[in-house]
A protein has these predicted regions:
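Conserved protein kinase catalytic/activation segment
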Residues: 1-11
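Active-site activation/catalytic loop segments of kinase-like enzymes and analogous catalytic loops
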Residues: 8-9, 15-76, 94-109
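A structural motif corresponding to the C-terminal end of an alpha-helix
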Residues: 74-85
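General secondary-structure edge motif
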Residues: 13-14, 81
């Protein structure tokens, strides 16, 4: 929530039950951060993305990226890897993107983007586990 008058910003995430404490698992919060920074969730929800399906059910997608996006993403992943298994974070991130689909049913292009990124993340993790 943003209270512009009092210059106050509060984050509330109704994550449900995740983790063994009332505060949940910190990996979920890290995945939410990666979901935003690397995955481009906010960019997509702000309309800075195009997505379409071609004849062979291929999803074509373009997401606006600031000049330093790749560097920031790489740096965040390095920070994550210092403390957690990046594949576990990517798994949660992929599930976060997939879980957004029903919440954005009024915007098919956005759903395509979320679906595509979610499946990409899950495939990245599954491909690593089969090696």
């Amino acid at each position: 929530f943003c209270d512009f008058k009092n210059k106050n910003f509060k984050l509330i995430d109704p994550r449900g039950k995740w983790g063994s404490t009332m505060f949940g698992d910190l990996k979920y919060d890290v995945a939410k951060l990666r979901h935003s920074v690397v995955g481009g969730f906010d960019t997509i929800t702000n309309g800075l993305c195009t997505a379409s399906i071609s004849e062979g059910n291929h999803i074509a997608m373009k997401i606006f990226e600031p000049k330093n996006h790749q560097e920031v993403s790489k740096y965040l992943d390095e920070l994550i890897q210092n403390q957690w298994n990046l594949n576990e974070i990517k798994l949660i991130e992929g599930l976060l993107f997939i879980s957004m689909l029903p919440l954005h049913k009024d915007h098919f292009e956005r759903q395509l983007a979320f679906y595509s990124i979610g499946i990409q993340r899950l495939n990245e993790v599954l491909d690593k586990t089969s090696e």
